[in-house]
Amino acid sequence: MDKKSPGQTGKDQRIETGVNRGKEIEIFITNHRVRASEGETIGAVLTAIGMRQVRHAPQLKDFRGLYCCMGSCYGCLVTVNGRPNERACVTPAQAGQQITLQEGFGRPDMASPDPAPARLVRREVPLVIIGGGPGGLSAAIAAANTGAKVLVIDENLQAGGQIYRQLPQTFQVEAPAILGSDYVDGRSLFGQVQELSNAITIWNDALVWSVGESNQLVVTRGNELVLLDAKSIVVSTGAYERPVPVPGWTLPGVMTAGGAQVLLKNQRVRPGRRVLLAGNGPLQLVVANQMLDAGMEVI
């Protein structure tokens, strides 16, 4: 990066062992040139260079940062190429992007061209599975083995869910064992899905907006609005954390355990060097172990 961006602190937090990152690109954050790799999200790039303060809420000085890292909380909204309110945690970095850290909810650039209207598509599907995590993929395999044709719909760029989160396709894995058992087990499950590719279709980066009467689903996928008439539907959407609000819970640098896990597993970026884990449940111990493996200090 040419010079330090506002709010940037510390060393680069990328974990370079075990993977070869995608092609190096340049993006611009508040007019500062920043190094990124194809496949990284904007949120991962911000975290890697130490920028915890992503925006402030409508109230001045109410600063916000990455929190859930899975697109659920909308706490990390940024403006990308003039388009406001993009979620930094799930928006891929692309060469030449102009990223502006927002004040409040941002305003659209009225001089920019209107996006093309969505194309309406309608089709019939025997079985739709909503969610491409371990449960959804296992259900798809079981159904396909009975001869059913299956469509799996997942909102992420890659299937796998929180447990089997995979690296971006632009990353080359050099040492799978370093990535942990979840990565290895996930690859095994994906291999089973691939063997049944004649029966299983996966739509990534697609959102199910509603399920109506007679099992009709409304799905957005790219620039398409898809109406699906399904004979059967399996809901396997997983879950996300709902933390108890405490004073300071929205401060930059505070995030959910699941959010930290996304950065570690999917982006190979440390959420920090020294971290305090607060809460209960088995996930805390799993994340603590993953943080230690990444060279972080857990206090």
Q: Whereabouts are the PLM-identified features?
A:
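Short helix/loop capping segments that flank catalytic or ligand/cofactor-binding pockets
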Residues: 45, 243-245, 286
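A short alpha-helix-loop-beta-strand transition element characteristic
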Residues: 52-56, 269-271, 297
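Cysteine-centered iron-sulfur cluster-binding motifs in ferredoxin-type domains/subunits
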Residues: 35-40, 65-74, 129-132, 136-138, ...
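Conserved short loop/turn motifs at secondary-structure junctions
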Residues: 33, 60-65, 178, 207, ...
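Beta1-alpha1 glycine-rich phosphate/pyrophosphate-binding loop at the start
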Residues: 127-129, 134-188, 271-299
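Short amphipathic alpha-helical face segments that pack within enzyme cores
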Residues: 41-45, 138, 255-259
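FAD-binding core/adjacent interface of flavoenzyme oxidoreductases
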Residues: 61-62, 82-128, 165, 185-274
